[in-house]
Amino acid sequence: MVKKMKLKFLFLILSLLIFTNKSYAGDLTVNDIKSRQIVVCGTSSDYRSLAYKKNDRLEGFDADICRAFATAIFGNSENFKLVYIKRKNIGKALNSGKIDIMLGHTSLSSNEEVSQNVLPVDTLYYDKQVFVSRIQTKATSMNEFAKNKVCVLKNSNAAIFAKEYNNKHALGFNIIEFPDLAALKEAFYTNRCELASDSEIFINDFVRNIKTDNPTQILPETITYIPIKAYTAGNSTQLNTAFRWIINALKLAYSNGITAQTIETFTSSRSTSIQNLLGINQKSWMSMGLLPEWVKDYINTSGNYMQVMDRNIGKSSKLEIDNPQNELIENGGLLVVQPFI
C-alpha cells in the first residue's frame, strides 16, 4: 500500500514537472520574462554589425533592438542578453525557452517555419543578395563572369537564389557549396572561386574585416531582396504580439519624425496613435504587460527605427550601406507601419 502511494506521488510530481516545462516553453509570455528578470535575444555570430562588444558594452543592430524589448518590459535598457544561435537550432532554442526571440539576420523559408514551429514577428529590415568578386573589374554585365566558380553557403536560401539566377540568365556558373560561412570566406580568399554570393550585409562585413592583399569588389547586381524577420516560438502568441508592437513603435516614431530632440512637442498631440505610442493613454501598452512610457525612454537614449538602422547597418555605419528598401513605403521603400490604435 505504501509502495503504491509512493509510486502515485512520484508520478504526480513528474506530471507536474512535464506540464510546467511544456507550459513555459510552448507558450512563453511577457510575465515569464518578468519573472526571469532578463530578456534573451538570439543572434548570429556570422554578422559582426549585429552584435559585438565595445568597451564592455554590447553594440550592434540586434543589441539595440533587444534594448527596446528590455526597456518596454523592465524600464532598464540593459536587462537583456544575446545568445548565438545557429540557423538549424532556431526552433529548438525558441521552443525550449532558451531564447525569447530570434533576431540574427534571419529569413526562414515556409518549410523551415513549419518544421521548426516558429512564428514571424515582424520585418526588421531588408537586405539583398549580391556578388563579390576577387578582382577589381569594370565589367558592365554579369555575362562577363560566365562560367566562373561561385562560393555559396550549403542548403541556404542564397544557394537556391544563386542557382535560379544562374539558370535564368544561362551564365554557366560552377556553384560550389560550403558547410558554413567561415569555410565560404576561406575558400573565397584562397582563390577556390572567383565570386561569392550572399547577403549584402554579410559580404560588406567580411570584405571590410578580413585583411588581405587581394583586391575585392562588390558587384552592383542584385539577385533578390531579403526580408529579415524576428521570430518567436510558434505557440507564444502573446509574446509575439507584444514584440511586434514594440518593433512597430520604433518605425511609427520614425514615420512621425519623433526623435530625442522633438519628442516633447508630441506630448500634446491629439492623435490617438501618438497618445498610445507615448503612453499618454496608458491602457494599450499596459494591456500587453509593458511599461506605458517606454517609448519616450528608448527614443531619448537610442533613437527611432531609422536612427538605430543608420548607425548600425546604414549610411552612418562602417558598412555604409544605402538600401532604399529600408525606407517607409510612402518614401519609396518597403517598410509598412501600423497606427497604434
Segments (PLM) and residue ranges:
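Acidic, polar ligand-binding/catalytic clefts
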Residues: 67, 71, 75, 79-144, ...
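Bacterial N-terminal signal peptides
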Residues: 11-18
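Bilobed "Venus flytrap"/periplasmic-binding protein-like clamshell domains
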Residues: 40-49, 58-73, 107, 127-179, ...
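Extracytoplasmic small-molecule ligand-binding "clamshell" domains
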Residues: 27-103, 290, 294, 298-302, ...
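Solvent-exposed, polar/charged alpha-helical surfaces in well-ordered, non-transmembrane soluble domains
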Residues: 31, 63-71, 88, 92, ...
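C-terminal functional modules
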Residues: 280-341
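Extended ligand-binding regions for polar small-molecule ligands
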Residues: 67, 71, 135-139, 143-144, ...
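Sec/Tat signal peptide C-region and signal peptidase I cleavage site
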Residues: 21-25
